Amino acid sequence: GKTRTLTYKIAYELSKIESNKQFVIAITYTNSAAEEIKERVEILGVDPALLWIGTIHSFCLHLILRPYHLYMDNLKYGFTVINSYDTEKILTELCKAYKNPRISYWDCGVIAKPDNIYLTCIDKNKHPSLKKVMKDYYGILENNKQIDFEQILKYSWDLLDRNLIISKSLSKIFSTILIDEYQDTKEIQYYIISRILKANNGNTKTFI
């Protein structure tokens, strides 16, 4: 049902593109959904060369951070994305120092919002210790020129928010943005997409 509808919308929008400088952007909830939709578009006989499809993290990484990281002081000398295994290892080690209250890697969840990155742990008694752990964790990442998944979203928003030229450049090459599973979109993802859409005065079409 829903995937099929999205596939047909993508195929239709691709068939209408007249310039090879414009792209149809489709944002999916998972990488496997992206692969499936791309395959279906090809089965319909439509060339996916002007389709960019992937998750919001992939979108931010490949279309915002990598092309424009020079605009950010802490990213301009390059960066890599830390994997979840290494993140877990670092946080588990850092948590060992805290016994009262005892904290673990599972308490270290965070969520990126437009103004900051926040702890998601519901036990407020653990927050003072967790704040210290996360400060040390982000310090280690900075020393290693690494960023994690939530920072991908936060830094992408910061770049768009501080540099109108980036939103304008992106909006000119995006003819259409389609978003799958829109109800699962976080606030910061909504901000990122909205900023790009606004920069083109509503000329970039969007389907959700």
Kindly give the residue locations of the regions a language model identified.
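Walker B catalytic acidic pair
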Residues: 181
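Conserved catalytic network of the ASCE P-loop NTPase/AAA+ motor domain
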Residues: 16-19, 45-46, 169-170, 198-203
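Alpha-helical scaffold elements adjacent to nucleotide-binding pockets in ATP/GTP-utilizing enzyme cores
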Residues: 9, 36-41, 59-63, 90-94, ...
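DNA-processing P-loop NTPase/helicase core
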Residues: 67-87, 97-102
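Accessory N-terminal region flanking or inserted into the helicase ATPase core
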Residues: 2-5, 23-25, 95-178, 187-192
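Conserved helicase motor core of SF1/SF2 NTP-dependent helicases
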Residues: 2, 186-208
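Hydrophobic "anchor" residues on beta-strands that sit immediately upstream
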Residues: 51, 176-177, 206-208
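P-loop NTPase Walker
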Residues: 1-71
